[in-house]
Each structure stands twice: as C-alpha cells, then as structure tokens.
Amino acid sequence: MAVPGSFPLLVEGSWGPDPPKNLNTKLQMYFQSPKRSGGGECEVRQDPRSPSRFLVFFYPEDVRQKVLERKNHELVWQGKGTFKLTVQLPATPDEIDHVFEEELLTKESKTKEDVKEPDVSEELDTKLPLDGGLDKMEDIPEECENISSLVAFENLKANVTDIMLILLVENISGLSNDDFQVEIIRDFDVAVVTFQKHIDTIRFVDDCTKHHSIKQLQLSPRLLEVTNTIRVENLPPGADDYSLKLFFENPYNGGGRVANVEYFPEESSALIEFFDRKVLDTIMATKLDFNKMPLSVFPYYASLGTALYGKEKPLIKLPAPFEESLDLPLWKFLQKKNHLIEEINDEMRRCHCELTWSQLSGKVTIRPAATLVNEGRPRIKTWQADTSTTLSSIRSKYKVNPIKVDPTMWDTIKNDVKDDRILIEFDTLKEMVILAGKSEDVQSIEVQVRELIESTTQKIKREEQSLKEKMIISPGRYFLLCHSSLLDHLLTECPEIEICYDRVTQHLCLKGPSADVYKAKCEIQEKVYTMAQKNIQVSPEIFQFLQQVNWKEFSKCLFIAQKILALYELEGTTVLLTSCSSEALLEAEKQMLSALNYKRIEVENKEVLHGKKWKGLTHNLLKKQNSSPNTVIINELTSETTAEVIITGCVKEVNETYKLLFNFVEQNMKIERLVEVKPSLVIDYLKTEKKLFWPKIKKVNVQVSFNPENKQKGILLTGSKTEVLKAVDIVKQVWDSVCVKSVHTDKPGAKQFFQDKARFYQSEIKRLFGCYIELQENEVMKEGGSPAGQKCFSRTVLAPGVVLIVQQGDLARLPVDVVVNASNEDLKHYGGLAAALSKAAGPELQADCDQIVKREGRLLPGNATISKAGKLPYHHVIHAVGPRWSGYEAPRCVYLLRRAVQLSLCLAEKYKYRSIAIPAISSGVFGFPLGRCVETIVSAIKENFQFKKDGHCLKEIYLVDVSEKTVEAFAEAVKTVFKATLPDTAAPPGLPPAAAGPGKTSWEKGSLVSPGGLQMLLVKEGVQNAKTDVVVNSVPLDLVLSRGPLSKSLLEKAGPELQEELDTVGQGVAVSMGTVLKTSSWNLDCRYVLHVVAPEWRNGSTSSLKIMEDIIRECMEITESLSLKSIAFPAIGTGNLGFPKNIFAELIISEVFKFSSKNQLKTLQEVHFLLHPSDHENIQAFSDEFARRANGNLVSDKIPKAKDTQGFYGTVSSPDSGVYEMKIGSIIFQVASGDITKEEADVIVNSTSNSFNLKAGVSKAILECAGQNVERECSQQAQQRKNDYIITGGGFLRCKNIIHVIGGNDVKSSVSSVLQECEKKNYSSICLPAIGTGNAKQHPDKVAEAIIDAIEDFVQKGSAQSVKKVKVVIFLPQVLDVFYANMKKREGTQLSSQQSVMSKLASFLGFSKQSPQKKNHLVLEKKTESATFRVCGENVTCVEYAISWLQDLIEKEQCPYTSEDECIKDFDEKEYQELNELQKKLNINISLDHKRPLIKVLGISRDVMQARDEIEAMIKRVRLAKEQESRADCISEFIEWQYNDNNTSHCFNKMTNLKLEDARREKKKTVDVKINHRHYTVNLNTYTATDTKGHSLSVQRLTKSKVDIPAHWSDMKQQNFCVVELLPSDPEYNTVASKFNQTCSHFRIEKIERIQNPDLWNSYQAKKKTMDAKNGQTMNEKQLFHGTDAGSVPHVNRNGFNRSYAGKNAVAYGKGTYFAVNANYSANDTYSRPDANGRKHVYYVRVLTGIYTHGNHSLIVPPSKNPQNPTDLYDTVTDNVHHPSLFVAFYDYQAYPEYLITFRK
C-alpha cells in the first residue's frame, strides 16, 4: 500500500529496458534538488513489474506540482551520459500498492543474492562521498555485517601525525590511502581509521598489535564497535527530546525506532540512539531539515565519547557570555584603580575569557576568548564554571566594610580620613561610611576611622563647652604683637587657649575657656589701641626700594634688630610707620630717614651697561649685599637719551656699592665729543694742513674722526672722558687760528662755471695761495624751500604751524627727524624702498628689526613700530606695514593703510619729533593702486591734524618719493583732499614764499588774521566739542534747547542743568529777535555759553541782516568784557532760519573785521567758526570767503561793495530747487520759477502796456492780487505820468510799492529806471517778471541780457548802496533755462572793457593787435641765481688774494648778447614761457625791455650762444606768424568764406578764411578746418564741409567789393598771380626804362616785367584809400625803387614787402623796408646783389609815403605826430624831409611791387 500522506509521480527515462545500477540513488538526488528539478523531500521506488520505471513519492503536494509544471527534466550522470526524464501522474492507486508489496518481498532476499565479488566498476559506483555519510557496502557477506570497519588507535601522542598513521595503515593493510580514511581526534588522544573497502578488520587489529612501529609509538589499536547512535548538530532553538524523537522516527526522514534521545540545548546538539543500526545508513545518506534548519548528522561512538566527523571539522560552539555582579563600592574602587582592573583582566585571560566592565553599574560581562576554541570540547564545557570560580577567588581578595557614622560627625572628620589606597564613601541615606578596597587595607583603615570617630566625639563635647572670639587686626599690628612678649605671656598663663591668625580675613581668633578668652582679648585690645602710626614722605627712589623688598623681613632688619618695636607699610605714595608707642614711633622715623639713601650715576654711553663685566659686577654686589634681607637695589634707566644708574638702600651698602660702580663707569665708559666745525671746508683744511696736531691727540688713546657718518659736520673725538675733554680744547684752539671768508656773486652761470672745473680751480687756489675753496650749498633748508637737489611740488598748511610738503627726493637723505619705511610683516627689508633704506642704514637697522619681531612677534597689516636708524641721518625709523591690495576687500585695505599712517604719526608724536617723511606705502609690490594709495595717505594725515584739537609736536610732514609720477600723484591728492583750502605755492628750492603785502590779510589753511590782529580760525568739528572760552548757541524764542539740532547737541553734552539755568536767566527778560543770554557751560569744555535768538532770512531783508550783525557784535563785546581770549560761532541761521551760507560767511567775517578795526582789543584774540565736518556747503562757503580775503579781496564794513570789480560776476549756485543765484558786484541776482504775486520784496515790478491797464498775463495777476485801489491809482497816474513808468502802492501784495513799466519798451532802460528809483527810496530788494517776454513778444535771451546788463551798469556806476537783491520770477520753465544759460555765460567773469574808436582805428592800421593790458600780464620771471664761495686759509691776506683771483675768473667768462627787434613786442605767453624755460635750463639771465623792444642775455658764453640761437628762432617764428596774419587781414578785405548752419550763415575766422583761399588757389581738392571746435573736411569741388560723424554743412565763397584791376593788365586767365614781360615797344616799358636810366644809364636792361597780383593790389589800394581819407589833399603815393637779390624775387612777387624784410639791408633810419627816389641807390650791389650770371634786380614800386618825418635807427614804427595823441603816427620816415632820397615804410601793404627790372652791368 502507498505511503500515507505522500504524492507519487511516475518517472520514465531514456536508459532503456535495463536501467543502470544505482539509478535509484541518482534519481532521488535529482528530485530532492529544488534547483535541478523543482522538487524537494521525496522517496524513489523502482517499479518491480517494469524495472525501467520508477515512482517518486513527494510529501508536500505543491512540490510534486512544481515538478510536473517543469517541462524538461534531464539527469546528467558523469560517465554514463544524459538521460531525458518523463514525469506523469500514476495511472491507478493499485499500481502504487503493487510497488510497495514487491519491495517488501525483495527486501528479505536481497542479502542472499549477489554474494559474489563485484567487479571494479560496480565497486566504484558503490562508493559515496564522506561528507554525505556512508551507504552500506554492497555485496558484503551477512556474517560480516556486524563486524565494524573502523579501527581506533588510542593513546595517540602529540608527535604522531596523520601522515605517519596513513603510512602505517598502508604498510600493515597493504591498501592505498584511497581505500581508507584517517580521522585524528586530539581532544581524546585517539585516531580512527575507516576502511572504504572490505577487509578483515579483526586480523588488521591483530597485525597492528604485533607491528613494531605501533609498539614503538605506544599506540593501542582496537576494533571500534558498531554504533547505533548518531550526533545531530545545528539544531534550531525550540527543539526538545520529544520533537526530535518524532522527527527521527519519521520514515520520510529515513528514520526508524528511536531507543533514546539526549538533548544538549546549550550546544544545539543531541544524541539519537536507534534500535536498528541499519537506520543510521539511511539517515546518514539523507539531507535533513528541522524547522527549515539544515541538520548535521554524524555517527557517535560512546567508547570514544565523540562523534566521527570525517573530513568535516566538528562544529565547536563557544559558550555564551555571562554577567557577574560586584558590590557597587568595590566596583567604584576598581574604576578608580585602572591598574587593578588590568591585573584582574590579565588573570582572567588565563581562563580564556575577556572582561567588559560596565561604566554605569557594578556589572562585569565575561566573554569567551578566541583562544578557547583551541582548548578542546571538554574544556569548553567546563569553561563557565572554571571562570566563575577564578573570579570568586579574585573577589575574595577585596573587602567592602560599612561603618555607622552620624552625618555631622562625618562632615567633621571626612578631611582627616582620606586615603588613596581604598575607596571611602559616605551613604547619606544609610548614614554609613563604606570602605572598599583590598582586604588588608580596609582592615587597617577601619581601625583608624573608628579611633578618629571616638576622638572627634570627645573633641566636639569639649568645644561645646568652650568660647570662640574673633578680633580684626591688620597684618602689621599682628606682626608687632608677635614680636612683643604679649602672646607668649598669654599662652603661658592660659595653656588651654588657642590663638590663630587668618591673614586673608585679618581675623585673630581666640578659642578656649571663656574666662581665658576674655582675659586674652582685653590684653590684646589694650596693646593694639596703644599702638601709634604716622605717614612719612620719602623720595621716589627709596619708595621704589621699599616696594621691592619684603616689608616684614626688612622691618625686622631695620627696626626689630635695632630693638625698635615698629614696622613700615606702603600706603599710596607714602610710608606708614606703626609702633607700639609714640616714643618708639619717633625712633622708627629717625631710623628710616637716616638708614636709607640713594645715589645716581649718569652714564653717557649705555654700552658700558651692556658689557659682561658690568653685569658680573652688579650681580656680585647684589649677591653680597642682599644675602638676607635685601639691603640695596640697582636700577638701570636706559630708555632716555642718557642712561642713569640709581643705587638705593641702606646707607652703608649704598655708599659701598656707589663707590665701586662709579669707579667702574669712569674707568670703562667711552664717550664721544663732537666739535662742530662749520663750514665743512674748515674740517678738510684742518685735516690736511694741520697734520701735526692729530698724532698728539691719538697718543692719549683718543680716536679722531672727521665728518663722521650720521652726525653733524665736525670732528668726533672718542675715548676716555678725561682725555676727550682735553682733546676738545686742543681742537678748538687750532680751529680758531684758521681764517674763513665767504664771497657772494650774482653773475649768471658763475655756479655752473665753477662746478665744471671745480677740481682744477680748487687745486690752483691751493697751489697759488695755500687756501681751500668750496661752492657753498644750502646746508639748511630755508623756510618754504627744500633741500638741494630735491624738488618741492606743493606746500599746504594743515593746522596753525603745521605744514604738509610734497617733495621729490631720496628718503634716505631728508632734513627730518624720522622717516617711515614701507615694510612687510616680518620686518625683512628685501626689496624696493625698504631694501634701499636698509642698505643705507647698515646692518644695525635689520638687526634691531629682527629683535623687535623676536620680542613682539610679526606685525599685522595696519600696524607700525619704531627701530633704530643705523647709519641713516635720522633719530629713528618707523616701520609701517601696509595691506596687500585685494579688489574684493578694498574697504578693508583702505582702512588698514589709513591706520598704518595714523599709527606712524602717533609714534612720531610720542617721541616728540618735529618732522617726518612718509612714502607711498603699499603702492609697490603690495599692489595698492597709486591713486587710491596717495589719496588714503593724505586723507589720514588730514584727519590726524585737522580733526584733533590737541597740540602737535610734528610741524613738518613730507610726502616723498624718487619717482616723479608718484610725487605728482601725491600733489594731485593733496589738491583734491584740500580743495576747499588755498595751499601755498611751491616755492623754488631754497627760496622762502613771498610774504603778504602790507594791508593784506595773512592766510593759512583755515586761518585769517584781521588788520587789527584778531585771528579767525576755520574749525571742522561739532559745537559740543568746542574748547574756546565762549560758545555761541542759537535758540528759539521759547528758549527750549531740545528743539534745534545745534542747541540739542549742546544740551546732550552739557546736561539738563544748562536748560534749567537758561530758563532762570530768561525769566523777566522780554525775549525777542536779537536777544543774547549768558549761562555757565556745565559739562561742556568752554567757560560760558551765549544763547542768541537769531532772525529768519526773509529774503535778505535789511532788518534780518542788521539783527544778525548786532548779535555777532554783542557776543564779541561780552567776550571782551569778560576778559576772555576766544569765542566760537557756529553757522547760526543757515539751517532752518534760511540764511544763505555764502552770505552768512561774508556777513560774520565782515563783522569780525569791523569789530577788530574799531576796538582796541585787550583780551580777545581768537574767533573760531565751528562747522560740522559733514556740513560741506558751509565749509565751502567759509573756505571761499577766507581765500577771497586772503587774496586781498577785502570788503568794506557793509556786505556789498559796489566798486570791487575783482570777480564781478560770482558763481551760479542753486540754494533751493528751481532757484539760481549769483553775485553781480554787490547785488545778489536771483532767477526762480513761481508766482510773483506770492513773493515778498520792497518793490514788485509789473510789465504792462502804454495805458498801464493791461489785463493779461503777469500784469493781470498782479493787478487782481493787488486790489482795486492799485488799479485806480494806475488809471490816475497814467494820465499825469512824466516817465515811462509809474509807482503805486503795494496793495494786498507783500511789498511797499509796485513799479509799472511798459513791456514793449527797451528792457535795459526800464530795469535801469527801476533800480535808480529803488536806490532813491533806499529799498533793498526788487522782484520783477521777465519783462517783455509776454504780450510784447521779446526774445527771452535778449530780455535776460538786458536785465543783467542794466544791473551791471548800475553797479559799475557806484549807484548800488541800498539795493541788495534783484529777483526775476519766471512762470515758464523754458524761459528760466534761458536766464540760467545767460548767468552761466557770465559766471566768474570781470567787467568787459570798452574799446575806443581810436583803438579800433589803430588796430585797423596795424598799430596794435592786442590790448596793452593783456601784455602786462606776461611777465618774464626774474632769475635770481647766485653763488656763494667760501675760502679757508692760514691768514686774511691769503684768503683775500684767492677771492680776488676767483672773481676775475668769473668776470672774464661772462658773455652778453643783445637783440632789438620789433617782433619782440609781439611775444605772447608761449614765447615768455620759452624764455623762462631758457633761464631755467641754462646758466643765463634774460632781461626784456618792452618799449624799445630789446632782449638782453647775460651768462657764461656757451649758454649765451645757445640762448641766442633759440631767441632768434623765436623772433623769426613770430615774424612769420605775423606775416600770415597780415595776409589773412588782406584776404579778408575782399574774400569771405562762410558756412551755413541751420539756415544761418556764419563767417570763418580770418586765419581759416586764408587757409581756405590758399587751398583754392593751390587747387587742392579738400582742406581740414575747425567749425565750433569740431573737425570738418571741406570739399572745394562740392563746397561742403563734413565732420567725422558724417554731418555736412554747405560752404560758400563771397567776393567783397574790391578795387578794379588796372585796365592795362593782361588777361590772367583765372590765375591768382602772373608776371608779364613787357615788350621794348610798349609805352609802359619806355616809361619805366626812362625813369631807371635817369641815374643808371651805365647798366643794360635785359627785361622789364609787370607784376600782376590782384590780392596785393587790392590790399594796397585799400590801404591807400584809408590814407587818402586820413591825410586829405596830401599826395600819399610815390613811385620809388627797391633793390633786392634774385632769391627774394619770388617772395616779393607773391607777398609784397611785408615785415620780414624790415631792416634787412639797412637800419639807419628805422627798422622798416627802404625805398629809394633814384634807381642808382637801389642798384648798388649792397641791395641788388648780382646772381651767378651777373644779373641784378630792382623793383619799381608804388609806395604810400603819406605824411613823413625824419627817421632814426631805433624806430620800429613811425613816431607820433602829437605827443598828446600817441596813436596818431606818421606814415613813413625819410632821410631828409625837404629833399628826401629814400623812404622807410613800416607796415604791410604800404607798397606794391609794380615792375621788376632785370639788368646787368
């Protein structure tokens, strides 16, 4: 029957009718594999009726279903091939039952069949792998089945290896090692041999027993019993005996009846014993899973006590960790003793375990160590028990013992029972002390604790019965009590009393029986109260000594040792003496004053204090004198210039020490004495010429140095003090014997002349006269100048007495006290400026810097430090570390640079230096942009000096660099930063700035001094910080200080008391505009505050100005009456009250000037104008006013000044939106957009019609707002008017009168009338519309010009006395723009001068091209070069001879040059600048005479010759320019070029006109010109001008009316010029020839040519027309001769006789062009020079001789006819007025070259 609960499948395969042997096993393995077949647990049975078929029984049905669902099944059998399997459900259940029946039958007979030996192939098939267990061997006889195939070798030694056993078995059995397995079990000292092939194991054992090797190895072989027990391992949790029994009895698992189950849960294993041994074969071959956990099954042999694992290693499971608990105190104890824990850990490791100590509780976790695996299974089983036993043994060495103790008792004794050997802990809840530690320690300490408890208990009882008292006694008084016998006496009388002293609380504690305590307290108090004290003054040196010694020890030495019961203590700066009695106090004072002393030793050379000898001496002295206690101290003061040693202490020791140290210093100190010898020339003379003196000095060990480095010029003597002083006297005697004289010369070039051959001249003077000579340089920089060779760019006054100088020069050679070096953080001077300074300074500078870094660390950017200067000529060098530039951190870089500069200035101030030089820090390798760098440095300097009111030691700050680019950047930065100030002009080196002229106000930056001596200072700071005697404050009428920003800032600093006092002062006073109240200053830095009620501006009303003037004057009067020195005014009224800032600045300064001039001031010296640094407008206004007055622009007492034309038109400003304002003379002129009817003024002007009743535009608005009364008044006055205007009342408008003018009339005339009318009525303000721009339709530009012109005329005539302000109110914004443009056009200009008719005429005639005023501005700089020579010699005679020789030499070298030329008059700014440059670069002096005109040059010959060439080139250039200008004038007379712009034609200027005409005549296609300052190209073909942007203008050429060309001229064929040769038959030829031949008949005429030059002809005729008109009936024209050379002919033909020919061949009668009456004069070879072919040329010329007079050689223009009228000149000059033979013409176009005669001899 079928297996219950199984699900069968029928399997057929491709193996045929005779299936292979063991196929059953292969199929079972295949279908058991889920991976190969999809199956699982199953059983395979062969169908007995059909051996080729098999039935597979699956237990879970779903497993069978999976096998069915898999389509292909293949069984791969190695060596036999692959078999295809077919699976299907069985046909009927009977078929299955039949299989089981057949199996039972075959089972019984199976062992009887096939007894014969199987063949080899069959034997191989029966072998199964060891790890799957062993199948029973086939074909084994039944009687052998109970004989074991396993042999055990017991008593296995450790030295027997598995190889040895295998070899033994092979030798004894004769089998190969493939036929058996050897398994060594070291835990039991046994090895088991399992035979794979059937042998006679009994015989094998017997053979082994006899084998000699077995005997030698002492092995005990025996036949291992056949077992029916298995060991099952890897059991899952939850298994038990019953479930295991059921599992292994299940046939599905291959099991059978179980005899016994022994389960080992801790090992997850069990022993299963079966009744039937054969079951083992099935189970061992079956793969078992228990609760889805795969099981490991091994045969178990009881005789061995273990299972056989075969090739598998036994699964050894280590025991689980377990915990042990320690007593908590013991655990705490061990936690504090790490070494004990380590000892326990080490001991437990021997038990193969590891301990983990809990950090929170007394738990110890014990885990098996990895080494336990090697100890074997028996040891593993007993591991936990063994470990617990060992730990218990260790724990027994320690003890925890509690002791019952009261908490109060414990607090008392706990500090006495501390012992590090054990843990002592108090349990508050249990009131027990717990002792934990090693047993012996705990027992020992327990005894001590119990004894301490007992003794303490008794002590507490005694204390409860005793008394404790505290007394406050100072340490000093306690010191005296201790040294008196009182305390010892008390302790003797009262032995039970305790006396102790707490120095911290200064309490003296008495403890003991109450009677004893009270007695002791009374006696101590009595003693303390009788003590006496006294403060005495001692010197600072002695006080310092007492500070350094211990007062107790020194009091014992000073007082107690002398039996004086006293002590000293330091109290503040005095010494407090305390004694037990007044008598002892007197003795103590006497003792202190007599026993202590100090002495000083001045040390000139500090180096002596740094030597080892000095250090050793002072050390030994201090050691000797201060053995105990200290009796002397030695202080070395080396920070000052001269060092000092102070010895302080006990008199005897001080005297001894002083004597020794003084002698040492005198004997070892070297000193220097510099004998300053001036001039330095004397030093050279003494050094060379007085050689006999120096060896005498050197014999006494005094070193002599001439002109030592880094010191003043002189002779330095170095040596011992006595010898040096003697040597100084010798040097002075020698010096006095020398004669020195200086000679000064102002000959130009003298200095350079000497310098060129200085060595030669010096050697000659020495050879000839025995003297020394030198050129005296500026040794000391004069005020305003700079050192020699260093260029000063600017000077700016920073503060009174402090100047900022920008100068180009070498930072290592400057006349300053200290310089700033741009350094890096490490003060390593590797490159750039730092390297240059370091090289000049020598190694001392770098060494000192290294010490600074070592001492103070690296310097961070933004810091500065100071070091020695080494060999540099400075006291110190300041090293400033600037930042490295980063664009991302620019603000930080600027901050750091600013900080570095300011710290450098602070260091200079700290060391009391007067001058400092600063370079462009960080601008080099640190990459700081130069512009940003210099601006930051200048700003930092400005802040340091201008915003700090404290006094400054620094008086000169130099900004220096060798690079001109850097210095220029510095100068520009100074100009920018100080733009509101007027810097001094940079004076040339060595020259002081010009002093202010008499009557002018002296001016420094922010400073003015009035003629009366009152100083005015411009101070930029808040009013609350003012430090003057008096401060002025602006307050409202209610006197509330918190309402205004000015008074509020004062109130905040002064405190509320200021308001309270002001209220008190104001009571009973009628406060109104102009009231001045005086109060105290309270917390302010001044002495008094003057509170003023300032007026509102009210458009500049007279009353407001008057009140403000009265306020200012009264404040100064109060200051003077209080006998105070200074007063400070803020810009009162310029804020909410509306005073314009520039008007207030002018008003207050004017009032101060007036007050100073009218009063004899006794005490008032300074008036400060306080301006907040952020109030830039007020600062600018005051700075402008300061600068204006400093320039001599002093105004009168009144604010306006009519006649001052300096800067007649002021600058245009915009005080409010839509308002523009400027000064016109003394009048404030405003234009504003708005409604005129809302304005407030003395007069409002109405622009109306002829009938004065216009009801349109502005007139309508004015009449309607003014009211009906004004209209009626207009009607009445219109009928009776005598002028073009009428005056009515103001009506409802805010004015006194309305002046009605006619808008269509002349606007300038109308405004002038209004101004005059207002002046008559003393009105100060006028408001008018843009007259005529409405219905009269006048152009706004013309109206604006007319109004401004009217005001200008009014002011210029001096009429403006009352009128202060004129305001134009405009309705239309475009009209406002026109007015603004007109104001800007006149901004900053002066009055225009009017040109007279005569001057215009003179200009036309060529007398003058420029006004003389302009030339007066061109002044040739006066060069005052001088040289001073210093001569040194033996006596006066030698020196004077040498001076005379030098003067003669210089005089001979001087070379003069003179040039007299008319063109010198035409020199303009360019020529003057060139002349000035010549003076600068050459050793010459140039003087200029404008009248002659004449240039004189004086200097050394080579420079004079160079100047001559350049001056003559200048004259030639000017002459050519004038010729061009003359041509331009000529051309412009009849040709005019114009361009058209916006349909308006504009003329080109005359030079451009000439340029265009020349280009046209030269037939150029294009020419470049300028139109309105833009470049245009004119196309002469299309007549268009095009600019660079393509914008085009049309151009045209106009021909003016001109003189007709002579009719006899030949056709010029559109040429501008031609020469026509005349035929001898022409009448013209004959006429000219006959005239020539009258005096030149001996010459042969080759040809006569007519010159046809229309331009020259027109110019000549125009000049003739003018002369004819001027001279009336005079015959103005003559035909004369003029001889010339061939080279001049082309020029004359084209240009005529212009000024370039003036004086060319003669100057006897003037420097003009000469024309002769007779031809023979001109034909002379002097004038008509023959060419190479012998041809000569003479012109027959038309000359305008006009009215003439006698000439002379000095004339460059004709003389005047009348001395009273210098512009009315003669036309020409002649040699003889009555019989002239020649004429001299001076002007262009005064002659026309009509005919050219070519002839030869």
UniProtKB/Swiss-Prot annotation:
Species, as recorded: Homo sapiens (Human)
Top-level taxon of the source organism: Eukaryota
Family the entry assigns: Belongs to the ARTD/PARP family.
DNA damage as UniProt keyword: no
Post-translational modification summary for this protein: Auto-ADP-ribosylated.
GO MF term (any one): nucleotidyltransferase activity
Gene transcribed to yield this protein: PARP14
Residue ranges annotated for the PARP catalytic domain, each copy included: 1605-1801
Residues reported in the UniProt entry to bind a glycoprotein 1: 824, 833, 922-926, 961
Pfam families: KH_PARP14_1, KH_PARP14_2, KH_PARP14_3, KH_PARP14_4, KH_PARP14_5, KH_PARP14_6, KH_PARP14_8, Macro
Residue list for modification Phosphoserine: 33, 1403, 1411
InterPro entries linked to this entry: Macro_dom, Macro_dom-like, Mono-ARTD/PARP, Nucleotide-bd_a/b_plait_sf, PAR14_RRM2, PARP14_KH_1, PARP14_KH_2, PARP14_KH_3
PANTHER family reported for this sequence: PARP/ZINC FINGER CCCH TYPE DOMAIN CONTAINING PROTEIN, PROTEIN MONO-ADP-RIBOSYLTRANSFERASE PARP14
Gene Ontology terms: biological process: innate immune response; negative regulation of gene expression; negative regulation of type II interferon-mediated signaling pathway; negative regulation of tyrosine phosphorylation of STAT protein; positive regulation of interleukin-4-mediated signaling pathway; positive regulation of tyrosine phosphorylation of STAT protein; protein poly-ADP-ribosylation
Gene Ontology CC: one annotated term: nucleus
The protein's name: Protein mono-ADP-ribosyltransferase PARP14
Catalysed conversion reaction: L-glutamyl-[protein] + NAD(+) = 5-O-(ADP-D-ribosyl)-L-glutamyl-[protein] + nicotinamide
Binding site for a glycoprotein 2: 1023-1024, 1034, 1046-1049, 1133-1137, 1175-1178
Principal location listed in the UniProt entry: nucleus
Complex formation: Interacts with STAT6. Interacts with PARP10. Interacts with PARP9 in IFNG-stimulated macrophages; the interaction prevents PARP14-mediated STAT1 and STAT6 ADP-riboslylation.
Tissues/organs with expression: Expressed in macrophages.
Keywords annotated in UniProt: ADP-ribosylation, Cytoplasm, Glycosyltransferase, Immunity, Innate immunity, NAD, Nucleotidyltransferase, Nucleus, Phosphoprotein, Repeat, Transcription, Transcription regulation, Transferase
Region (Disordered): 109-132
Annotated signal peptide: none
